C-alpha cells in the first residue's frame, strides 16, 4: 500500500506557500493533481507545475468569488463526465505580457484570489482556467476542484487554488499513478494525500447536516423510525426510514442494508408506470423490513435524476415524441444525471452506518457514495418491475447509463421478470 501523508501536513504546506499532491478515487479520474494556494502563486511555483504536469493550469474558486468576478460557464450545458465546472478563461488585464508565461499566469492566479479584485480586472479569453467549486467542497463533490478550495480555506487563505494533473515520467502519454506519485512526492519534498482522506478529515471535524425530528411511522411494510434532516447549504429536507438498531450497544454500524432512494413524485406517490421508482422504493422497504435492520434514505431534491419535477414533465413530452430519457434531458440543455450523494453520505454517517450492503442497480451510485469514506461491501440488486410503459426507459438505463438490469430483452407484458416482488413480501 502506498504511504500517504497527513491532511494536517498538507494544510500546513498549503499555508506556507508550498505545493501538495492530491489523489482522487481510483473509480473516478484516478489521477494526482499538483495543488497550491492561488494567492501564494509565484513564477517558480507555476514553472514547476508546468514542467511536471499537462500544463492545463486551472484555478478552482469558491462560487461566490466566481459570481463576484463575473466568471460565466465555459459552456451552457456542462457535458464533462466528471462535472468539472469550467468557466471562461482569463488573464490579468494589467501587469502581464501575453499571459502565457509562468510569471504572467502567477499574476493572474494571485489576482483571482485577491478579495479586492473585480470583473473588470481581467480580460477574456485568457491563459488561466478558473473552475467553480461546489458549495460544501469535497463533502458535496469529491473532485480536485473542491479539494483545492477546501485546502486553501482550511489553511486560513482565500478560497482559491491552482491545480494541474501530474504526467507520468514512465509513459509520457498518460498520467502518473499512485506509486509513481509517491516517488515524485519524496523527490521534491511534497505531501501526498487523497481526497478520501480530506473527506474523512472534514467529516470528523465539520457537520453540514442537522438532525431535526424523529417519529414512529407505521407502514404496510412494517414500522420504521422516520428521522428528518435538513442540509445546511441547500436547506433541503431529507428523511431516513430506519429499521432496527444501526449502531449502539448491540450493533457496530457494519453490514447495514441501505437504500439511497431519489425522490420521484410521479412514481413514488402517483404510481406512474413510466418509471420503476415506486416499485424500487416499495421493494427496498420490504427488504429492509424483512431483514429487521437497515436504512431507506429518501433524498429530496433528486426529482428526475436531479433536474426537478417540471423539467421531468418536459422530458416526458420529448420521450413521447421519440427521444429516450438521456437524449430528452440533453435536448433541454440538462445533464443526464445531476444527482449529488454527498449529503446522503453524511446522513448515513450520522445514523452510525460504517459499512453497508447497498440496494441499487446503478453502479455509479456506488462510486458516488464510496468516495465519502463509507465502505460498501456489496451491491444488492433490486428487482425490476417492467411494463409496456417503462420498458424502453429501463433499456436506456441499462444500455446508456450502465445500470445492471437483466431480463429486459425477454420482456412481454404478460410475464413478470425474475425476482419481481409481489404484494405479499
Swiss-Prot record:
The lineage of its organism: Bacteria, Bacillati, Actinomycetota, Actinomycetes, Mycobacteriales. D-ribulose 5-phosphate binds at residues 28-29, 33, 141-145, 165. This is Riboflavin biosynthesis protein RibBA. Binds 2 divalent metal cations per subunit. Magnesium or manganese. Binds 1 zinc ion per subunit. Its EC number is 4.1.99.12, 3.5.4.25. Zn(2+) binds at residues 264, 275, 277. Mg(2+) 1 binds at residue 29. Keywords: GTP-binding, Hydrolase, Lyase, Magnesium, Manganese, Metal-binding, Multifunctional enzyme, Nucleotide-binding, Riboflavin biosynthesis, Zinc. One of its GO terms (molecular function) is 3,4-dihydroxy-2-butanone-4-phosphate synthase activity. Its cofactor is Mg(2+); Mn(2+); Zn(2+).
